[in-house]
Amino acid sequence: MIRFRSDRLAAALLAACLAVPAFASAAEPAAPVVVVRDQWAQAAYVTPKAQREAALATLASQSEALIAARPRDPDALIWDGIVRSSLAGERGGLGALSLVKQARRDFEAAIALDDAALGGAAHTSLGALYYQVPGWPVGFGDDAKAREHLQRALAIDAGDIDANYFYGDFLRDQGDWAGAAAAFEKAIAAPARPGRDVADRGRRAEATRKLAEVRQHLASR
């Protein structure tokens, strides 16, 4: 059975984004997008694990309706992708593949409309998918594309908490322990985002935990 790594797919992301990555932008997203964004943070970081899949499945119905109403809104597309990625992480197995494929389509559509939307969140989330989803012939995983999208996200916003977190996680997977440590440190030091306390606290805790693991590995060499 294929098992998606739920701690990583839960934001994309991987973020997200996904994100799953949890993103902010200079211009506040439309109110319906903010509702999905904030409910995602609650589902990802507050809802108990046993109830998380059901909460995300309900939210996926809302985000699907959101993009039906706002098909050319990159922010809405990004958040639908993040919700689907997070749900895939909780669900796991072959059943998650259809969710991450739809998430990829969402992120690609958002990039085509505005690749800098939500501070490059579509690149962060798409990059996170590329290094966590299995490769061919099962899935579309591709480490080269993961690096490309994560670096593009950092070029758009070098201080973004999610872009740095997922880049650090990617580098850790690649065996670049020093690079991973530097990226996690940047994620932890990222400035707080207005109205994003829950997401910031959760992502910072994840980065702190991963940084401790990386430092332990570096110290043991």
Question: Which residue stretches match the model-derived regions?
Answer:
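Short coil turns that delineate tetratricopeptide repeat
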Residues: 71, 115-117, 158
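N-terminal leader/linker segments that initiate helical-solenoid repeat arrays
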Residues: 24-62
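Terminal, low-structured helical/coil segments at or just beyond the last alpha-helical repeat
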Residues: 183, 190-221
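TPR alpha-solenoid repeat register
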Residues: 76, 120-122, 163, 197
